[in-house]
Amino acid sequence: LKMHEVRVEVRRMGGAFGGKESQGNALAIACAIAAKATKKTCKMRYDRDDDIIITGKRHDFRIDYDVGFNEDGKILGIKFKHYVRCGWSQDLSLPVADRAMLHSDNAYNLEDVSITSHRLKTNTQSNTAFRGFGGPQGIIGIERAIDHIASHLNLDPIEVRTINFYRSSNILSEGFKYVFCN
């Protein structure tokens, strides 16, 4: 079958962000195999329930951490381990997992930080780009750590957040001076 002999018609792609780059591949492969075997046009469309089950969504993460802090709640060091459920294929899992790592500081000056990311191949649908593209997952890790620090020290979580915020004098891990702080 030559490429010019293939015609794909799509009723609608949907809106928003993510899932349109590679999530249709399973359908396309199934149609190609059926068309080649029968030498006839093939049409396939998931119903909504199957679409939800088969196509990937946001990557779910497990984030483990060890954190050191002083009596004021100032974080002295933190070690994150991200476990990312990618599903049966890589899809966009690598950049999603990378972005989660890059957002692990959120708005906080973490002077001594280690982040490892384990991208897990599982027998579930292949997860893909989704709103936030890994950012929300990375942010949740540090926010949860701060909540635990506040609870352990019996402090208001807002106080712990405030003491750890970036300041204009901070130098980021990339070597840039943080200048957009109040």
Q: What is each PLM-predicted segment?
A:
Residues L1-N182:
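Structural alpha/beta core scaffold segments of enzyme domains
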